[in-house]
Amino acid sequence: MKKYLVGGAVRDGLLQLPVKERDWVVVGATPQEMLAQGYQHVGKDFPVFLHPDSREEYALARTERKSGQGYTGFICYASPEVTLEEDLRRRDLTINAIARDDEGNLIDPYQGQQDIRQRWLRHVSDAFGEDPLRVLRVARFAARFAHLNFRIAPETMALMQQMTDELPLLAPERVWKETERTLATRNPQVYFQVLRDCGALKALFPEVDALFGVPAPAKWHPEIDTGIHTLMTVSMAARLTDDIAVRFATLCHDVGKALTPRELWPSHHGHGPAGVKVVEALCQRLKVPNPLRDLATIVARYHDLLHGAQSLTPKTLIKLFSAIDVWRRPARLEQMILASEADARGRTGFENHAYPQGDFLRDAFRVASSVSARDVMAAGFSGAQIGEELNRRRQQALASWKRQQENSDTETIQD
């Protein structure tokens, strides 16, 4: 029995990145021998065991053979006779097919170290094409390692382009899991660009793919193309926040523009509310968690309103705050502001512009929140009157605050 460290732990160690978890492959062992040594069997479909002390995963060396469609259509064969090289051959990319033995020696039959040095994401063998989920995995690795200048090998991209027919067979949960993990990387926009380059975006995210080729007014969008703007917005969101809900919301914020009749281009009046049903359909299909869905829909509906925040009347501001439920969920306002700032700065030439609307909305919410329902009830109001009076007083507080702001600005100009 021989044990080897494999996969991401070896790869990340070679890249001098933090190693978050370690996976092992065991050659020359049977399930009975693993159990006898105290390992716990956890693999439903594969012979995977947990170490009795470290709780790290140890998998028996295995091979896989295609038996049907999709990512589940495989027959696995695990046996003490399966070699390390055979086990590594079934892996997706050469950089993930390197093993390290207990003396620190690297076993690298598919030149993964060379591809790490040259920054290539390259498939190990043609068996790569048997699992459509690998299209998403490669796109995720491209996003994860974009800051290290990794790129997809041309022959791997060509193979990915041939695999799009099986993508609709992927379970929505698997598509979302890869997407969710990608949204947490520093360059999530690369994932969606790779999916577009290989033809997978149209199959998996048709709502986003439809934005490419849809023009916006050059005055406000020098990049013109709404698809390009969307990816720029996702990129900007990743610079502004680690919150994947905000990042996902920026992906969806302009999907309504794909519904604009061509004769109205490049104007997209009302695209925000129009996009809400599109966002809801996308989220339902991919089983996106409700908190992310809810933020994405309100960002789609209201992001244009936030861009003109300073010109909103106190009445409209209170309506906006109520619509996005910030009284009960104050953190949502910050998410909305970040998504809208990413939208405003996700444009060619606007990347370093300030977004004063953000501080204006934060201050406006602070002023409105200073009026409480307790104050209204103490003044003798009850029932439905409480809500009406609360809104009136909050509008009054905002009106007074806005006048002070305007007077202060006037005095500054005169000085």
Swiss-Prot record:
InterPro entries: CCA_bact, HD/PDEase_dom, HD_domain, NT_sf, PolA_pol_head_dom, PolyA_RNA-bd, tRNA_CCA-adding_enzyme
Keywords per UniProt: ATP-binding, Hydrolase, Magnesium, Metal-binding, Multifunctional enzyme, Nickel, Nucleotide-binding, Nucleotidyltransferase, RNA repair, RNA-binding, Transferase, tRNA processing
PROSITE patterns (UniProt xref): HD
Assigned EC number: 2.7.7.72, 3.1.3.-, 3.1.4.-
Cofactor note: Magnesium is required for nucleotidyltransferase activity.
Binding of Mg(2+), residues: E21, D23
HD domain span: 226-327
Cofactors (names): Mg(2+); Ni(2+)
GO molecular function list: ATP binding; CCA tRNA nucleotidyltransferase activity; cyclic-nucleotide phosphodiesterase activity; magnesium ion binding; phosphatase activity; tRNA binding
Annotated binding of ATP, by residue: G8, R11, R91, R137, R140
The UniProt record lists the keyword Metal-binding: yes
UniProt catalytic activity: a tRNA precursor + 2 CTP + ATP = a tRNA with a 3' CCA end + 3 diphosphate; a tRNA with a 3' CCA end + 2 CTP + ATP = a tRNA with a 3' CCACCA end + 3 diphosphate
Domain notes: Comprises two domains: an N-terminal domain containing the nucleotidyltransferase activity and a C-terminal HD domain associated with both phosphodiesterase and phosphatase activities.
Record NCBIfam families: PRK10885.1 (NF008137)
Subunit note: Monomer. Can also form homodimers and oligomers.
Record-stated family: Belongs to the tRNA nucleotidyltransferase/poly(A) polymerase family. Bacterial CCA-adding enzyme type 1 subfamily.
Further remark: A single active site specifically recognizes both ATP and CTP and is responsible for their addition.
Protein name according to UniProt: Multifunctional CCA protein
Organism (species): Sodalis glossinidius (strain morsitans)
Source taxonomy: Bacteria, Pseudomonadati, Pseudomonadota, Gammaproteobacteria, Enterobacterales
Gene name in the database record: cca
